[in-house]
Amino acid sequence: MFADLDYDIEEDKLGIPTVPGKVTLQKDAQNLIGISIGGGAQYCPCLYIVQVFDNTPAALDGTVAAGDEITGVNGKSIKGKTKVEVAKMIQEVKGEVTIHYNKLQADPKQGMSLDIVLKKVKHRLVENMSSGTADALGLSRAILCNDGLVKRLEELERTAELYKGMTEHTKNLLRAFYELSQTHRAFGDVFSVIGVREPQPAASEAFVKFADAHRSIEKFGIRLLKTIKPMLTDLNTYLNKAIPDTRLTIKKYLDVKFEYLSYCLKVKEMDDEEYSCIGPRRALYRVSTGNYEYRLILRCRQEARARFSQMRKDVLEKMELLDQKHVQDIVFQLQRFVSTMSKYYNDCYAVLQDADVFPIEVDLAHTTLAYGPNQGSFTDGEEEDEEEEDGAAREVSKDACGATGPTDKGGSWCDS
């Protein structure tokens, strides 16, 4: 097709400049340099690198990248050749091979089109859908298989809930212990006052000793609060700083992941479009003019994949460190909590054992309860009122008899 035109078709570079160069690569044990080639006769006037594979001579050298045009192999021009012929030329060379290329000076922002943005949005929506739901809605699930970071994110959320519950429980427990210590202090103050006012020395000493025991328990409670309170600070640091920072990193990773998947999907669509036009033997305009749009997307995909791989590595390292900190920190915090509580109860038990002062003998005042012949019987107020009423009635009857005079034996009144 291009032989008839002698390759004088003007390339549509989309304003993307190219810089010529050459690189010498040492082949690996499989006699490969680690690149895949696209384009070439008979539909495209140039050959270009589609992908640079990881951990290969081309990838380790880093000179050539996806989208770069290949112009020659070991000083021989490849103009008008197919990609299969160029691949054979590279394979025939043993040891070192020199690749002549035109470096594509592409700006990744040029590849971030509206189509890529919409694909990222679709991937975000489909990410949390099940396969059945996505198929019912006619959406393809272009996701990475065995992406363990999604499960790690769920584990992180469960860990955050665990720490949140521990923090709330510890706050309530410390508040209860503070109120309990204040109650012990009030007990100590009350028994101290009783001991000071008690006239009997033995009883006074017993009350004071019991009061000191409660005051000591109050001090033990304050010491417990001071020991466990830093536990809240550590838990809050993990909950409010470490976990949100890791969650933000995972969100950035997901954004890079969706961008990479969007470019992969775009490349797949452009490949399908190109293959569909091969059958009728008519080339696409972008293919016949150098396929620069496709090469730009290839470069963007490669750079997005590099960012994705680096971000994934960083997230895995951060998650690993966070898991180690979680295991070590939770063990340390629980050990500190248990040891502090154990010391508190042991100290309280020892203090109360020393303050075993009951029963206490107390002499009550003589005015309260008195026994003896000189003391009258105890009467309450109701009996005194009844006696007063009976005395008043007898006095009234005597007065009546004195006013009317005496009576005779028959019971009749007689005048004096």
UniProtKB/Swiss-Prot annotation:
Modified residues (Phosphothreonine): T82
Gene Ontology MF term list: actin filament binding; Arp2/3 complex binding; G protein-coupled receptor binding; identical protein binding; metal ion binding; protein domain specific binding; protein kinase C binding; signaling receptor binding
An example Gene Ontology CC term for this record: neuron projection
Subcellular location: Cytoplasm, Perinuclear region; Membrane; Postsynaptic density; Synapse, Synaptosome
Location (main, coarse): cytoplasm
Domain AH: 144-357
CDD domains to which the protein is assigned, alphabetical: BAR_PICK1, PDZ_PICK1-like
Keyword match Calcium: yes
Start and end residues of each stretch annotated as Disordered: 373-416
Membrane topology reported for the UniProt record: Peripheral membrane protein; Lipid-anchor
Lipid attachment site numbers (S-palmitoyl cysteine): C414
Pfam annotation, one family: PDZ
Binding site for Zn(2+): C44, C46
Tissue expression notes: Expressed in all tissues examined, with highest levels in brain and testes and lowest levels in lung.
GO BP terms: cellular response to decreased oxygen levels; cellular response to glucose starvation; dendritic spine maintenance; dendritic spine organization; glial cell development; intracellular signal transduction; long-term synaptic depression; monoamine transport
Presence of keyword Transcription: no
Domain (PDZ): residue spans on this chain: 22-105
Subunit structure: Monomer and homodimer. Interacts with CXADR. Interacts presynaptically with the glutamate receptors GRIA2, GRIA3, GRIK3, isoform 3 of GRIA4, isoform A of GRM4, GRM7 and GRM8; with NAPA and NAPB; and with BTG2. The interaction with NAPA and NAPB disrupts the interaction with GRIA2, conducting to the internalization of GRIA2.
Function text: Probable adapter protein that bind to and organize the subcellular localization of a variety of membrane proteins containing some PDZ recognition sequence. Involved in the clustering of various receptors, possibly by acting at the receptor internalization level. Plays a role in synaptic plasticity by regulating the trafficking and internalization of AMPA receptors. May be regulated upon PRKCA activation. May regulate ASIC1/ASIC3 channel.
UniProt comment concerning the protein's domains: The AH domain mediates binding to F-actin. The unoccupied PDZ domain is probably involved in allosteric modulation by forming an intramolecular bridge with the AH domain leading to a 'closed' formation. Binding of a PDZ ligand, such as GRIA2, allows enhanced interactions with F-actin and the Arp2/3 complex thus enhanced inhibition of actin polymerization.
PANTHER family named among the record's database cross-references: ARFAPTIN-RELATED (PTHR12141), PRKCA-BINDING PROTEIN (PTHR12141:SF1)
Name assigned to this protein: PRKCA-binding protein
Gene source species: Mus musculus (Mouse)
